[in-house]
């Protein structure tokens, strides 16, 4: 659904800019498989995320744009890799250019996050065996879980409930 595009972008869903950048790092390293131990790719990705964090328009699509600006083989390969996920209709929730207005907010009394068609891997499936849809589903699970924790820890003077419908699906995944 085009009207929901980018709602789960880490830069959009997190209230704190630093938290958004941290979650963006987690999501993009998860999706691309770039390890913190990769001395070539990891610094390039982190630098691009940092530039987006410091910009006016924050969104994962802008990380791709920042990588392209570097005009290096490594940066272009990382940009291509991230962009390959954007082509999935399902992934539209995760990627924005930072112009999303209908954002999910910690200040709302009620947030309903319903993601249809999540395909979560079996608990026994190794990370290397995840399909692309499973990777994207787990990435969304990570974003939703991080938002839920942020919601729980915000303004503790207000009573809150987080209801995870069909939580068994979340709990059957290693990341859940």
Where are these regions (language model features)?
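P-loop NTPase motor domains
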Residues: 1-176
